[in-house]
Amino acid sequence: MAAILELVEIERHFFESHKPLIILDKANFILNRGELVALVAPSGAGKSTLLHIAGLLEKPTAGDVILRGVSCAKRSDNERTAIRRNDIGFVYQFHHLLPEFTALENIIIPQMIAGFKKSIAEDRALKLLTYLRVSHRANHRPSELSGGEQQRVAIARAVANGPSVLLADEPTGNLDPVTSAYVFQALSALVRQSGLSALIATHNYGLAKQMHRRITLKEKKIVELP
């Protein structure tokens, strides 16, 4: 299988009271094209840090992130922002939708920032909302949506620009079990239907078992799970 995202010898160190705090130590990982991979690890293990590095939101202390065969280690902040905007979609535990805009507008705006015409952005946004069965809420603001509806809108926003990689940090962690299962099924179906590659952090091993592979963080390295 062809690699879409590679983490190579990733190290991430912080300093706490003048002492180094090592979060990741020579961590390696390959996400293949079309794969759905679960990142299963307890709170505080470094899941969010790993996702932020993979998504070019945070620079590693050492190592390289290779996206679609392109090294990102020495890219400028502007270059990293452009790569992230075009190639990476994010979904978080809390939706982070813009409260003053409707569900539809929340999906249109990132596309227009990326350079899409409004008519094209609106058409794609409506198709995504329809696919995720939340089109009837298109003109409602986030505060008027249920938790599950908010997350489905957030998923639509994350994939609207046509990224090659989707990164999700506990996307169902704030939902009840029934809604969580529904949102996960919607997310995984969209990933498979669109040919995306996805790395999804979750505490839910039942959901993780439905993905192609499972990884965890052990002794500050990335380890495959059965």
Swiss-Prot record:
Domain ABC transporter: 5-225
Name under which the protein is recorded: Lipoprotein-releasing system ATP-binding protein LolD
UniProt record similarity statement: Belongs to the ABC transporter superfamily. Lipoprotein translocase (TC 3.A.1.125) family.
InterPro entries: AAA+_ATPase, ABC_transporter-like_ATP-bd, ABC_transporter-like_CS, ABC_transpr_LolD-like, MacB-like_ATP-bd, P-loop_NTPase
PANTHER family reported in the protein's UniProt record: IMPORT ATP-BINDING PROTEIN (PTHR24220), LIPOPROTEIN-RELEASING SYSTEM ATP-BINDING PROTEIN LOLD (PTHR24220:SF689)
Assembly mode: The complex is composed of two ATP-binding proteins (LolD) and two transmembrane proteins (LolC and LolE).
Biological role stated in the UniProt entry: Part of the ABC transporter complex LolCDE involved in the translocation of mature outer membrane-directed lipoproteins, from the inner membrane to the periplasmic chaperone, LolA. Responsible for the formation of the LolA-lipoprotein complex in an ATP-dependent manner.
Originating organism: Bartonella quintana (strain Toulouse)
EC number: 7.6.2.-
